[in-house]
């Protein structure tokens, strides 16, 4: 499947420089690509932790601006498309994989001009009236959706055949139930007799953290031996992060709540927890769900977005009403008071990940999408 003894050159387009779920998923992909078939190249917009991570795996990206399209600037748009065309020619690109909505349209236009197939990777539930990817969904050759909920965004019947649903995967060796969380407990002065409930993710207003903190207040009324970990940092809105800290003081739970900030030792943090919570009602395919299940941790998660496709209610965790702190608290208390249920859900979660959500499966299915298009393109 190699062209003239050489690998296929894949150009990845990515606008963000932070390290969030989409960035981790993309890094997992390019690290594990079959390098006898594919050579990854990147076009990104700015320096940051994601770019540092690329350089750590010996990938040097090109830089290009992806302007917004709601208030289009014709000069900037032309410059972006011209810049992409130059990269396509210089690197002899065989296929483009656009990882974010902001780069999708520009990548598609540049791909069409240069007769190169393009894949859009859709990782979010678009909110609001202006869903540009749905509007322009006739442009890409394939659309990868990371959940059925994301797939449902695309309403045009004619594009159904080009959509592939490929759910995120997790490395079972990295997220191992035998990981040691004792150092985390020691770092934050958590007694071995205390129970730990944690949530992991970007600290943004739409992620449901206020509901998590209110549920913490309710839980502490019944179970005073519980500590709460909030793992992550704000992408932009640091004032919201500050307001959450102030909220814990107002609720009288500040001595019981720990904000860790950004952490890279996620397996150890999960290992320190007894229950992992996803309060967000807008996540399409949260990585923390797979990672927690892989480590045999039971989940309490909002019954919304792509979460019900991953968490089996009453089997690997408990699904709760989005935005309902009382329901969340009730479910967390139920698990904390039943050790056998904690273990039962945890083991079922690990089993489910091994059967359905491995990183190997995710990579293979993505490579198959590439090969579908490259085989078709070579015969045209």
Residue ranges and their predicted role:
Residues 43, 298-301, 311:
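Short hydrophobic beta-strand element within catalytic cores of glycosyltransferases
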Residues 241-261:
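Nucleotide-activated donor-binding/catalytic signature segment of Leloir-type glycosyltransferases, i.e.
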Residues 23-28, 195, 199-221, 242, ...:
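A conserved mid-protein helix/loop that constitutes part of the nucleotide-sugar donor-binding site
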Residues 262, 281:
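Aromatic "clamp/platform" in nucleotide-sugar-dependent glycosyltransferases that forms part
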Residues 118-148, 157-158:
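A conserved, positively charged/aromatic
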Residues 313-314, 318-325, 334-339:
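Conserved acidic donor-binding segment of nucleotide-sugar-dependent glycosyltransferases
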Residues 98-104, 122:
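Short His-centered aromatic/hydrophobic patch
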Residues 176-190, 243-246, 363-365:
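A short helix/loop element that forms part of the nucleotide-sugar donor recognition site in Leloir-type
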């Amino acid at each position: 499947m190699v062209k003239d003894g050489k690998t296929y050159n894949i150009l990845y387009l990515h606008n963000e420089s932070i390290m969030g779920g989409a960035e981790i998923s993309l890094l997992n992909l390019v690290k594990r690509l079959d390098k006898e078939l594919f050579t990854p190249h990147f076009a990104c917009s700015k320096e940051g932790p994601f770019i540092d991570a690329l350089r750590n795996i010996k990938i040097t990206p090109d830089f290009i601006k992806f302007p917004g399209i709601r208030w289009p600037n014709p000069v900037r748009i032309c410059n972006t498309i011209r810049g992409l065309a130059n990269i396509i020619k210089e690197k002899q690109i065989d296929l483009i994989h656009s990882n974010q909505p902001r780069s999708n349209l520009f990548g598609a236009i540049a791909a069409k001009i240069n007769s190169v197939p393009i894949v859009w990777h859709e990782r979010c539930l678009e909110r609001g009236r202006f869903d540009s990817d749905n509007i322009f969904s006739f442009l890409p050759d394939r659309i990868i959706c990371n959940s059925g909920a994301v797939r449902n965004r695309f309403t045009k019947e004619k594009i159904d055949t080009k959509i592939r649903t490929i759910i995120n995967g997790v490395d079972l060796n990295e997220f191992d139930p035998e990981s040691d969380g004792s150092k985390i407990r020691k770092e934050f002065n958590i007694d071995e007799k205390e129970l730990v409930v944690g949530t992991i993710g970007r600290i943004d207003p739409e992620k449901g953290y206020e509901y998590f903190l209110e549920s913490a207040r309710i839980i502490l009324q019944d179970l005073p031996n519980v500590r709460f970990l909030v793992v992550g940092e704000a992408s932009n809105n640091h004032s919201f992060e500050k307001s959450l800290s102030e909220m814990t003081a107002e609720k009288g739970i500040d001595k019981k709540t720990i904000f860790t900030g950004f952490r890279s030792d996620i397996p150890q943090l999960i290992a320190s927890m007894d229950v992992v919570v996803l309060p967000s009602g807008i996540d399409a395919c949260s990585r923390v769900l797979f990672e927690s299940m892989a480590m045999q941790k039971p989940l309490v998660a909002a019954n919304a977005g792509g979460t019900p496709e991953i968490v089996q209610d009453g089997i690997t965790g408990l699904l709760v009403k989005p935005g309902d702190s009382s329901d969340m608290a009730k479910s967390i208390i139920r698990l904390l008071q039943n050790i056998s249920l904690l273990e039962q859900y945890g083991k079922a979660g690990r089993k489910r990940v091994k059967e359905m959500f491995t990183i190997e499966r995710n990579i293979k299915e993505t490579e198959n999408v590439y090969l579908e298009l490259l085989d078709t393109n070579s015969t045209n």
